């Protein structure tokens, strides 16, 4: 039941091809007043925070625990490889099932994967398994998020509206990278940021109830 797909209707104010082209300010006003769009953008902020924190700081986390830089490099390579599989699969599933509910599953699985990774003893097996799982979940949010934007407003202004959503992703990316480094400089570990990534997974699940 969690994956039954609803149908979205594009608002005529945006999609009507017979209307004159809207400017950026007008599109921004329409988006600002569309609450599900705001929730979607906030959810994408979570994605940016998590992937940049892991992409930048996971190799350092492994080095702190006695693993070689090669292990961190292989981790990133596996993430990149399985990201291809995950992104393609997410796009395929998004054509068949509810995109917001799929995003809820993705953020929830990210949180569970992080909890499992932190709970299990660190070994090359757990590191590479985590890399594969996170690779599948890495940017699988992108086709689903863009698909929701298209369902909300139609495709006429998809590039502009997706760019607005992606801006929040980049805000999250900044804080994922910056806070990770700041926290490590102050405390010598990433414990607070790990807790934040888990909490943000819960937030990511909750906000997509309203999309």
Q: Predicted segment positions?
A:
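C-terminal transmembrane helical hairpin of 12-TM major facilitator-type secondary transporters
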Residues: 79-83, 89-148
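C-terminal membrane-cytosol helix-exit motif in multi-pass small-molecule transporters
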Residues: 1-16, 207-211
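Interfacial helix-cap and linker-helix signal at transmembrane-aqueous boundaries
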Residues: 62-63, 93-94, 179-188
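Loop-to-transmembrane helix entry/capping segments in MFS-fold secondary transporters
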Residues: 69-70, 155-165
